[in-house]
Regions:
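Sec-dependent bacterial lipoprotein signal peptides
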Residues: 1-7
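Secreted/periplasmic proteins
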Residues: 7-142
């Protein structure tokens, strides 16, 4: 619980104002992805494989710069942006994360997380781990 509180304290500083949702269909390497509705996302909870990716200085799908010292994640079909709780099954650690990018595009993976999140959840060195992802809010949270 202490870790979760720590995550919440630095959840929004430095994030740009975003008044809406990015939910348009898109295509990657010939595969079309259709993001879920906001209503469906508000009830979303899934378990699967999380992978670590590094996008230091890259621009995410909503136009936000992603840095290794910030919390960010990528999901194929959640409306962007949204806020999720990610819990690592092996370590029991949880973190609150903003989903601001698209991916992962490797079969069998549920979510990609940045360096800071992978370290906080305890799987940075492993690269992959089983997690549960639960949506907390969608868009600007209103």
């Amino acid at each position: 619980m202490l870790l979760l509180v720590g995550c919440q304290q630095v959840l929004h500083p430095g994030w740009p104002e975003y008044k809406g949702y990015k939910k348009a269909p898109y295509t990657v390497k010939g595969t079309r992805f259709v993001p879920m509705s906001v209503e469906s996302a508000l009830h979303y909870k899934a378990t699967g494989i999380a992978s670590h990716y590094e996008a230091d200085g890259d621009i995410g799908a909503i136009g936000q710069k992603l840095y290794r010292h910030k919390r960010y994640a990528a999901h194929r079909t959640l409306p962007l942006p949204c806020t999720v709780r990610i819990t690592c099954h092996r370590t029991g650690k949880s973190c609150i994360v903003r989903v601001a990018d698209r991916g992962p595009y490797i079969r069998g993976r549920l979510i990609d997380v940045g360096t800071k999140v992978a370290k906080e959840l305890g799987f940075y060195e492993r690269g992959l781990d089983t997690v549960t992802v639960e949506v907390i809010s969608v868009g600007d949270g209103k």
